[in-house]
């Protein structure tokens, strides 16, 4: 079964950059591009969309809370109606730059705190899906399988793709272990092994030991981790060696 490889990109701001987006775009098949709320700005959005379009990489809107200082990782209480508008705003803005580059936004992936809160709360998940269908009912949602995001997508008639993480350990319940927890962020060797395990066995490492089932049609390699590009290159090589075809899900 083919597997998509994605990364969070375009997460700089002004003269400040994070990661080597150009090099990462040579390796991934889908790019989750920041839309200016948790990171990114109009110039970075334009540039990253152009780089992705040149390489035939699918463009996804990486939507988050309006929280540049906290990089979108702080929990923010928000009315679902306001969240719907903020998500629609972000998707629409990125789609403008994607179309200017000859491409389009084909999927949406929530970022950071929104990723986790919308996975747990149906009202927030419904707001994300409402924003997506407001713009284009054919948009695909990328997120954690078996959560309120998947349930909301099913109810809205939106295609859902489960996501696994190569460089993160999980809880026994199949959720990402908090970043601050010992062993939650995997080194390169462990990340390579986990990507192959997700692709071939549908399982990922549990932070306390053992493994847990992870339903994923796409695997994320974070672009802000040390040596992220080399890790992504090793993951692609390992997947190929395991007979896994890497291709975009849209």
UniProtKB/Swiss-Prot annotation:
Reactions listed under catalytic activity: 5-oxo-L-proline + ATP + 2 H2O = L-glutamate + ADP + phosphate + H(+)
Pfam family, one: LamB_YcsF
Molecular function as annotated in GO: 5-oxoprolinase (ATP-hydrolyzing) activity; ATP binding
UniProt keywords, alphabetically: ATP-binding, Hydrolase, Nucleotide-binding
InterPro entries in alphabetical order: Glyco_hydro/deAcase_b/a-brl, LamB/YcsF/PxpA-like
Entry annotated with the keyword Nucleotide-binding: yes
GO BP terms in the entry: carbohydrate metabolic process
Record's keyword annotation contains ATP-binding: yes
UniProt xrefs under Gene3D superfamilies: Glycoside hydrolase/deacetylase (3.20.20.370)
EC number assigned by the record: 3.5.2.9
Family: Belongs to the LamB/PxpA family.
Function: Catalyzes the cleavage of 5-oxoproline to form L-glutamate coupled to the hydrolysis of ATP to ADP and inorganic phosphate.
Quaternary structure and partners: Forms a complex composed of PxpA, PxpB and PxpC.
Protein name: 5-oxoprolinase subunit A
Organism: Nocardia farcinica (strain IFM 10152)
Gene: pxpA
């Amino acid at each position: 079964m083919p597997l998509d490889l994605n990364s969070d990109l375009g997460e700089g701001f002004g003269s400040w950059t994070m990661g080597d987006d150009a090099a990462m775009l040579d390796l991934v098949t889908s790019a989750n591009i920041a839309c200016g709320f948790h990171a990114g700005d109009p110039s970075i959005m334009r540039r990253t969309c152009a780089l992705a379009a040149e390489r035939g990489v699918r463009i996804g809107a990486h939507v988050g809370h309006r929280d540049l200082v906290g990089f979108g990782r702080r929990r923010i209480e928000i009315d679902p109606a306001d969240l719907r508008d903020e998500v629609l705003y972000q998707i629409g803005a990125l789609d403008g730059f994607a179309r200017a580059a000859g491409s389009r936004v084909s999927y949406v992936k929530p970022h950071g705190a929104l990723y986790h809160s919308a996975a747990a709360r149906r009202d927030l998940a419904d707001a994300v899906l409402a924003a997506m269908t407001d713009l284009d009912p054919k948009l695909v949602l990328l997120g954690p399988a078996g959560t309120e995001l998947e349930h909301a997508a099913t109810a809205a008639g939106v295609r859902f793709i489960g996501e696994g993480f190569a460089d993160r350990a999980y809880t026994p319940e199949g959720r990402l272990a908090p970043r601050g927890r010992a062993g939650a962020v995997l080194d390169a060797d462990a990340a390579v092994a986990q990507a192959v395990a997700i692709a071939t066995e549908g399982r990922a490492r549990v932070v306390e030991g053992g493994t847990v089932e992870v339903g994923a049609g796409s695997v994320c390699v974070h672009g802000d981790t040390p040596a992220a590009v080399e890790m992504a290159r090793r993951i692609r090589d390992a997947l190929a060696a395991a007979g896994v075809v890497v291709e975009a899900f849209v």
